[in-house]
Amino acid sequence: LANAAPRVDQGTYSYALESKSDGAGGTEWFLGANKHISPSASSVLALFNTAPTVWYGELSSLRSRMGELRFDGGQSGVWMRSYGNKFNVSESTGLAYKQTQHGFSLGADAPLPIGDGQWLVGVLGGTSKSDLDLSRGTSGTVKSYYVGAYTTWLDQSSGYYVDAVLKFNRFNNEANVSMSDGVRAKGSYDNVGLGASAEFGRHIKLDDGYFIEPFAQVAGVVIQAKD
């Protein structure tokens, strides 16, 4: 048998490869009842599950920018940020993998001529790359390209603020799978996503330039499925 491990990949699942004597000096091989998700199925599931964390992780640069606006009293202009994130998905979810994300965003914002300069609007764009490690020699990559628009409202006297963002993504997904017979296989697909986030909080200044910023956030994203 060419299998490098005592298992056989059969579609969605990998089955334990078992054997017994055929009674004539030979060996009979068969697939046992013990099964788990195959590397190829794991890679596809991980790639699709990663899209929301990719989308949300990219917001870290925008949240940093909006925090800067609040700290600097709403000084608008052109900005650029790089960022990095790590996510560990545990086995309890049914699919364990590690995700490492890095990317950059750039944008520009300006105050609206209403509300005494309390409102600002802006646009952003950027790209990120997420590397997935699914163990057993299987990995994946998600390259993301995005554009979006955002607005923020800040009341300087009270410190209350509202942030909102709408972001569109295009994802390039690629899987590198190590099969049970030692052969490596590759696959890729593209899909898109659209999401929005809103945050409400308060910027509370303390002595010596310190501050605290309690907030509540709600976010949602819709990811295009693929057959």
Question: Model-predicted segments: where are they?
Answer:
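Short, intrinsically disordered, charge-balanced linker/junction segments flanking boundaries
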Residues: 1-3, 56, 62, 226-227
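Extracellular, surface-exposed repeat/solenoid domains
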Residues: 1-34
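A generic alpha-helix propensity feature with a strong bias for hydrophobic helices
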Residues: 9, 42, 217-220
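Outer membrane beta-barrel translocator domains of Type V secretion systems
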Residues: 30-212
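Aromatic-anchored, glycine/proline-accented short structural segments
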Residues: 208-227
